[in-house]
Curated annotation (Swiss-Prot):
<keyword id="KW-0007">Acetylation</keyword>
<dbReference type="GO" id="GO:0005737">
    <property type="term" value="C:cytoplasm"/>
</dbReference>
<dbReference type="InterPro" id="IPR051052">
    <property type="entry name" value="Diverse_substrate_MTase"/>
</dbReference>
<dbReference type="Pfam" id="PF13847">
    <property type="entry name" value="Methyltransf_31"/>
</dbReference>
<keyword id="KW-0949">S-adenosyl-L-methionine</keyword>
<dbReference type="InterPro" id="IPR025714">
    <property type="entry name" value="Methyltranfer_dom"/>
</dbReference>
<keyword id="KW-0963">Cytoplasm</keyword>
<dbReference type="InterPro" id="IPR029063">
    <property type="entry name" value="SAM-dependent_MTases_sf"/>
</dbReference>
<dbReference type="GO" id="GO:0046547">
    <property type="term" value="F:trans-aconitate 3-methyltransferase activity"/>
</dbReference>
<protein>
    <recommendedName>
        <fullName>Trans-aconitate 3-methyltransferase</fullName>
        <ecNumber>2.1.1.145</ecNumber>
    </recommendedName>
</protein>
<dbReference type="GO" id="GO:0032259">
    <property type="term" value="P:methylation"/>
</dbReference>
<feature type="modified residue" description="N-acetylserine">
    <location>
        <position position="2"/>
    </location>
</feature>
<comment type="function">
    <text>Catalyzes the S-adenosylmethionine monomethyl esterification of trans-aconitate and 3-isopropylmalate at high affinity and of other molecules like cis-aconitate, isocitrate, and citrate at lower velocities and affinities. The function of trans-aconitate methylation appears to be in reducing the toxicity of this spontaneous breakdown product of cis-aconitate.</text>
</comment>
<keyword id="KW-0489">Methyltransferase</keyword>
<comment type="similarity">
    <text>Belongs to the methyltransferase superfamily. Tam family.</text>
</comment>
<keyword id="KW-0808">Transferase</keyword>
Amino acid sequence: MSTFSASDFNSERYSSSRPSYPSDFYKMIDEYHDGERKLLVDVGCGPGTATLQMAQELKPFEQIIGSDLSATMIKTAEVIKEGSPDTYKNVSFKISSSDDFKFLGADSVDKQKIDMITAVECAHWFDFEKFQRSAYANLRKDGTIAIWGYADPIFPDYPEFDDLMIEVPYGKQGLGPYWEQPGRSRLRNMLKDSHLDPELFHDIQVSYFCAEDVRDKVKLHQHTKKPLLIRKQVTLMEFADYVRTWSAYHQWKQDPKNKDKEDVADWFIKESLRRRPELSTNTKIEVVWNTFYKLGKRV
């Protein structure tokens, strides 16, 4: 994804402003995974958000490798890792595409040497069929493939902000024209059109979660599979910083015709405060995301 590879993309803000993933979700992955834990590869790892979390949250793997096409992202991941060298001593990072495992070396690539492959908040940018076939070629028998992501958050306690959460990312006066397609549309659809091939993987599990369900306890408890529930307490200022991590925001800022326009993220804050004047830029409020996950085991 070209924007995240740009030298002027703020990967540090991306790392600090993006949500992390709950411990109970990693516990579910632990329970799903069978067999050895020698090597985990996290493709499309960005600044290592999930890669470094997995090093702490999952039962130990001997080696964890995060890979990403963006040298900018990998540099940030390595800086974060170097801040806690003992915690992440089994973690390394490589510049590579999601379907290229040559960094494993000639003796290991396409030789079913990987125990788990993860793709977190990135698979919407992939050639999905090419990726899953490459994963199949590199996973050992019964090795785990785990794909998950999130999009389109809401503030559950402030339904009057719902239209803002559409206008800012998708409105014509907002960031709508600046998303790279078809990737964003795939993510917005929670990758529902991308399926793990049952000829390549078995014990396939898929879950979709709509953030609005947190407003309805009945719907929340009707999920047959435990959903990936990503929620976070943020200030309006912090949420604006999150908006600034979006690839579309970066493209919007690069467009000369927006030079004299009010910043989209600043407009979001101003409009939110107009609607709820009792709030301030530093008031903590809850945000919840739509999410999905897809799990499978190599046949």
